Amino acid sequence: MQDIRLIVIEGGSGTGKSSLAHSLQERFQPQQWLHFSFDTLLYCLPPSVLDMANQRNDWSAVDQNAITRSVYGCLRTLLDDGHRVIFDCVLMTERGARELLTALQSYRPVLVRLTCSWHEIERRTIARGDRTIEEARRGFETSGLFLNVDYEIDTTHRSSAEIAESLVPLIVGSSSHDAWQRSLDRLDTGSVQQPSYDP
């Protein structure tokens, strides 16, 4: 069994990344895992700036390059200090995938992708009220295009607790998670392969 210290959950807005991260944290107890994401730093911004970004999809007041550098810098520091981390993100561009791979290539995480039907994402987004439908749709259309994963899970009709219950044994019981290397290889070949397992 590998000594897993980093799990990356990738998926569009509304697919249940944060909910799964919290369920995994509880499922891994007594081993402690931290949950970290871009939102961790974005919610440090002034409320008016955050509201403009989330409610109006206007990111002009946010230095996204600086936020990205800081997110990965903080994440590397947490890992280097010995923490186990569940990191969730949305990858909407090839550049975003490259930044992730470059920043975290030495940590070889388990990669998990969450998917969901558009109808359910739309329902969740409206219920949450903290994202625009436009942003959710963009994530729905682009998620899965840029990163190979070890596990791909449809959350449309499954609770985060149910998913965590089935996913944790797979993570701790596997001797190898190679999606990270396949993702690095993909940068050269330009082809995205299928996940090794769909729990």
Report the location of each language-model feature:
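ATP-binding Walker
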Residues: 15
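Small-molecule kinase domains that catalyze NTP-dependent phosphoryl transfer to phosphate-bearing small molecules
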Residues: 124-199
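Hydrophobic anchor at the beta1->P-loop junction of P-loop NTPases
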Residues: 9
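Glycine-rich phosphate-binding loop used to anchor ATP phosphates in small-molecule kinases
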Residues: 62-108, 115
